[in-house]
Amino acid sequence: MSYYGNGGYNPYGAYGNVPPPVYGTPGLAPPTVHVHTDGGHHHGHHHHHHSFLHELGHALTGHHHHHHGHHFGHHHHHHHGHH
C-alpha cells in the first residue's frame, strides 16, 4: 500500500525535475511563463520563441547569449515597426 501512495510522487517529482535540467537553471522557469503572459498573442509567440533560445543559450553557454541578444534586438525592432 505504501508503494502505491508513494507512487504519487512520480508525476509530481518528474514535473519538478523536468524544468531544471532542460533550462539549466530553475530561475529561468518563471521568466518563460511571465513572457508568455506578458507577450500576449501575436507578440507573445515570437517573443516566446526567442526568449526560450535566449534563456537556454545563456544558461548553457554565455557567448551564445551575446549572439542571440543582437539578433533579438533587431527582430524586435522590425516587429515593433510592423505593428
Swiss-Prot record:
Family annotation (InterPro entries): Kreg-1
UniProt signal peptide: none
Annotated stretches, region: Disordered: 62-83
Single Gene Ontology BP annotation: response to stress
Keyword Ubl conjugation: no
Key word Ion transport present: no
Traits of the deletion mutant: RNAi-mediated knockdown results in partial sensitivity to Cu(2+) ions with only 60% of animals reaching adulthood 4 days after egg laying.
Tissue: Weakly expressed in the intestine, but expression is up-regulated in response to Cu(2+).
Keywords of the record: Stress response
Induction section of the entry: By heavy metal stress conditions, in response to Cu(2+).
Function: Plays a role in the stress response to heavy metals such as copper, probably in a fos-1/kgb-1-dependent manner.
Entry protein name: Protein kreg-1
Source organism: Caenorhabditis elegans
GN (gene name): kreg-1
